[in-house]
Design a protein with these regions (language model features):
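Short loop/helix-cap segments at secondary-structure boundaries that form the rim of catalytic
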Residues: 51-57, 117
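Short, flexible helix/strand-to-coil boundary loops that buttress conserved ligand/catalytic motifs
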Residues: 55, 71, 121
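Short secondary-structure capping/turn micro-motifs that flank functional sites
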Residues: 68, 116-117, 133-134
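Short active-site oxyanion
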Residues: 36-42, 57-58, 80, 106
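Short, hinge-like loop/turn segments at secondary-structure boundaries
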Residues: 60, 78, 124-128
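Glycine-rich, highly charged phosphate/nucleotide-binding loops
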Residues: 62-69
Length: 144
């Protein structure tokens, strides 16, 4: 129910600023990758079967369960990390971001995950190469 507007504008601003400090979205990640100099490494935290089914081209595969054991060997602490998992119904990217932050990495979560990446018709890489799926008609550029 939306009848208790107890957050002050300052509290709301602080809340949303905190979210934007640790989240990014599919469109912003795609634009950064397209620039050729994204300033971060994109990390797919899903398991091997999901990775093989399709992933964002250029992403690093590091399943969430293996972050504690492998992050230092596979990632550069001086480069921020953006994590993703399947999609909004999965908190794997959140868990991966938490695990990375606990061991000293600067990290953000890509909200929407791989599901929204693919639904927006962005390039997907598999063992057969890179393809761009047909965009879901329910997704459009929000222009924000």
């Amino acid at each position: 129910m939306i009848d208790n507007w107890s957050a002050t504008p300052a509290d709301a601003a602080a809340h949303f600023a905190r979210r934007l400090a640790v989240e990014t979205d599919v469109s912003d990640v795609a634009a950064a990758l397209d620039s050729g100099f994204p300033g971060f490494v994109l990390l797919d935290s899903r398991g091997a079967d999901a990775w093989a089914q399709g992933h964002v081209p250029g992403a690093v595969h590091l399943p969430g369960r293996e972050i504690a054991a492998r992050a230092d060997d596979e990632l550069d602490r001086s480069v921020p990390v953006v994590t993703y998992c399947w999609g909004p119904g999965c908190n794997g990217a959140t868990r991966a971001a938490l695990a990375l932050s606990l061991v000293g990495f600067r990290v953000r979560e890509m909200i929407g995950g791989f599901e929204y990446w693919a639904r927006e018709g962005l390039p997907v890489e598999t063992t057969e190469g890179v393809r761009s799926p047909v965009p879901d008609p329910l997704t459009v550029s929000c222009g924000c």
